[in-house]
Regions:
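Glycan-processing catalytic domains of CAZymes
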Residues: 2-341
Length: 341
């Protein structure tokens, strides 16, 4: 793919795929399924309790379980997704808390490269903010990706560069000098305000994305602005990727986060509304946040009730809903997006 202009890409759908999960049965320990009980605590919610609003239909699982990865890839391909953006916390860590877990991410990436190929999916990377992230750690992450993955044919590339989405990198001192070190990586950055776009272009970003699952929180995540953003990006020869989410609910994980950040699924209507605006923006790509982020409650992966965790219109759907509600809905929405001329 050449040229970053929004009009010069085929229509593609990407999804963020959480890779930090481990289980005692598969890996000898848990990661990804636990969360701090409050913002300053080192006391964690751990299985069998799960800090999410529902639980996976297949139960808690490991990102190293090939059977699970095949099940996911088959489902993701079936609904029309083209690219998996693997969450990447560094080669030797597994999750946000920067837990030392040597080689964990590498195993997941290598398994996904093999399995995604079987299902005709491509791989990119989403690098979120994590504890103690700084210039040095991000430099190490990017060097590792550049040296070990950028030339692999299974990776999704734009202008022969591996796609990298970065969530909070602009807050890191001297980050532009880091971008310019890697000529085999295509950087798309999260932004909040209209004034960010020009500055990010000067910094070396070749694209922008909205990322946030909570609509209206910033100028960029206000869906009524997406047509304008798409126009601004096109004028600067930058790629714009609007981000859609089915909802956002951290009431059982980030319990200290303000209620104003929560977004009800409204029985699927919130998701429909975001997709409608994404399609109308005429961007060639849409990002789903997420396939399986259970901690943030943004998952479309099939979910079931368990104990006190029940379906309702805020966290999933009404009493007539089933576990595949958002898989079915996503397939229909992707079809509408790809058919629009």
């Amino acid at each position: 793919m050449n040229d970053n202009n929004n009009s010069n890409f085929p229509k593609l759908v990407l999804t963020i795929y959480s890779t930090s999960f481990s289980t005692k049965e598969n890996d000898g320990h848990y990661s990804g399924w636990g969360y701090r009980k409050n913002s300053v605590s080192f006391d964690y919610i751990q299985p069998p309790d799960v800090p999410s609003v529902l639980v996976p239909k297949i139960g808690i699982y490991s990102s190293h379980n090939e059977t699970v990865l095949r099940y996911h890839c088959a489902m993701i391909k079936e609904i029309g997704v083209d690219v998996l953006l693997l969450e990447y916390y560094g080669s030797n860590h597994s999750d946000y808390f920067n837990m030392e877990n040597e080689g964990f991410s590498d195993v997941t990436v290598k398994l996904m490269m093999k399995i995604s190929k079987e299902y005709g999916l491509k791989i990119g990377f989403f690098i979120p903010y994590y504890n103690f992230q700084n210039y040095k750690t991000l430099d190490e992450d990017l060097q590792y990706i550049s040296q070990n993955y950028a030339n692999n044919p299974q990776m999704f590339k734009i202008n022969n560069k591996l796609l990298i989405l970065l969530s909070e990198s602009r807050d890191i001192n001297h980050f532009p000098s880091l971008i310019k070190k890697f000529n085999n990586l295509f950087f798309v950055g999260y932004f909040r305000y209209s004034t960010d776009v020009g500055a990010m272009m000067e910094d070396g970003y070749e694209g922008i994305f909205t990322y946030e699952p909570y609509e209206g929180n910033f100028w960029s995540s206000t869906i009524d602005n997406w047509k304008i953003i798409s126009k601004i990006a096109k004028e600067r020869n930058m790629l714009f990727i609007p981000t859609v989410a089915p909802g956002y609910n951290t009431s059982n994980s980030h319990r200290w986060i303000s209620e104003r950040m929560q977004r009800s699924r409204d029985n699927g209507n919130y998701y429909n509304k975001m997709w409608k605006s994404a399609i109308e923006s005429n961007s060639p790509m849409v990002l789903i946040n997420s396939f399986n982020n259970w901690i943030q409650g943004t998952m479309i992966e099939p979910a079931i009730e368990q104990g006190k965790l029940k379906y309702n219109v805020n966290v999933w759907g009404d009493k007539n809903s089933n576990s595949f509600k958002y898989i079915i809905q996503t397939k229909d929405l992707i079809k509408s997006f790809k058919q629009k001329t």
